[in-house]
Regions:
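Pepsin/retropepsin-fold aspartyl endopeptidases
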Residues: 11-430
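Bacterial N-terminal signal peptides
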Residues: 1-6
Length: 430
């Protein structure tokens, strides 16, 4: 979904309106926030102020504010937004859903889909699917989290027991009264489980219109499960939605590995964000949910949640000196520099041939890419770190919208890793 805002330049120096318009057109949300915070008072185009506030609220975890500014935009500036109105309404429906107002989320998308039909157009299948999903969720009870006043600690497990090569990180959970192992995955924007897992916990699969989810490739959902309770230590979630998917690939070896890993249930970042802050204490192998927030550092915020529901962390690349986007993925077995990074810095790899192959398996299939091993330095939260051997992907069909994927080995090389969702910042602690 694109937000279209035309810009034109009449001189050498671009106005703040033009720069903000370009940030929106390029989906550069961190740049948009920086521009607006430093120079937003000088905007001349009336609708750019509420539109900027809408996107900043949307991607920096302020759903209440996003709805407020979204309403203002739809009431006053529909003509100016034109073809971008559906995107605004879709994002607002997601905000309503985050707040547990599934009925409002469904109603908003219903009005959008009806407008398409009345205009003789075909409604967007994603909008239709989520209208159906939110409608079904509105009949299943409100999502909530019950937590004690003290810190909560949940043991972390890895498949290998080796911090340098953990392969997968899991937690033991109690779902609908059954003790089960679940992958704890910050790179998953939604919770998912297999049909087999749903049968194991005796959950009813609700039939919904399918959505496509991106893993190794796109895969269709096969319905929805709403679990009555999900317990992590002393935390209790109520009415938790999980999408049902087929984890199998067309590769027998990959399927065998996924079965060995017990890859059947994924707790995604939609269940992490309501906690406000989480700390991965890798020395003690504990997931800690603190009773009070860590004081906000001066560099906050340094990440946002993208339209694809990924955490985009701002790093300074040691090779180029530029800011780059990295996703933080506790479901990833390794760290990579993506093909997008390679294309931006191709001149740095002149004369080097991609001789290594990287094979990864996950939801939707198997992906094999050619890579070049490099040493890489980056700066996060004012501290510099070095990866001595990291693959740079020289070709890819996935068209990633980020430059780096930070996986488990990089994260677990440190004592702790903190993610604060209230003020949207991350950092290592050593």
């Amino acid at each position: 979904m694109a937000i279209i805002f035309a810009t034109s330049s009449f001189g050498q120096v671009k106005s703040i309106d033009e720069r903000i318009g370009e940030a929106m057109n390029g989906s550069n949300w961190a740049e948009l926030r920086s521009l607006y915070m430093s120079d937003g008072e000088n905007l001349q185009t009336p609708f750019l102020k509420p539109l900027s506030k809408f996107f900043i609220s949307q991607f920096y975890n302020e759903p209440d504010s996003a709805i407020k500014y979204g309403k203002e935009i739809l009431e006053k500036y529909q003509d100016e937004l034109n073809s971008s109105v559906p995107s605004i309404m879709y994002f607002m429906s997601e905000d309503y859903a985050i707040l547990g107002h599934y009925d409002k989320a469904s109603a908003l998308l219903h009005s959008l889909n009806e407008a398409y039909r009345k205009g003789g157009q075909t409604a967007n299948p994603v909008f239709e699917a989520y209208e159906d999903i939110y409608s079904k969720l509105s009949k299943c009870g409100t999502f909530s989290v019950e937590r004690p006043n003290n810190n909560v600690s949940v043991p972390l497990l890895t498949h290998t027991g080796n911090r340098k090569n953990p392969e997968m990180m899991s937690v033991m959970a109690n779902i609908n009264g059954k003790e089960v192992k679940c992958n704890y995955d910050s790179g998953a924007g939604i919770n998912i489980m297999t049909t087999k897992f749903a049968e194991h916990i005796k959950a009813t699969v609700i039939q919904t219109k399918n959505i496509q989810m991106l893993g190794m490739s796109y895969v269709d959902s096969k319905g929805l499960v709403v679990v009555d309770s999900l317990k992590l230590g002393d935390l209790v979630y109520r009415n938790v939605p999980f999408f049902v998917v087929d984890m199998r690939t067309d590769n027998p070896l990959a399927n065998k590995k996924l079965e060995e890993l017990g890859y059947e249930c994924v707790i995604g970042n939609q269940t992490m964000m309501p906690l406000g802050e989480i700390c991965f204490d890798f020395d003690r192998m504990q997931l800690v949910i603190p009773a009070s927030y860590t004081p906000t550092p001066t560099y906050a915020p340094n990440f946002y949640r993208s339209p694809q529901r990924l955490f985009h962390l701002s790093l300074t690349d040691g090779r180029s000196g530029r800011k780059i986007d990295a996703i933080v993925d506790t479901g990833a077995s390794g760290t990579i520099l993506t093909n997008r990074y390679y294309k931006k810095n191709e001149n740095c790899f002149t004369g080097r041939t991609a001789t290594d192959s990287l094979r990864t398996a996950g939801v939707g299939g198997v992906n094999v890419v050619k890579t070049i091993p490099v040493s890489w330095t980056f700066t996060l939260a004012g501290e510099q770190y070095t990866e001595t051997n990291i693959p740079v992907v020289t070709s890819s069909e996935q068209n990633e919208e980020y430059d780096c994927r930070i996986g488990l080995p990089t994260l677990m090389a440190h004592r702790k890793f903190i993610i604060n969702f209230k003020n949207m910042w991350m950092r290592f602690e050593d």
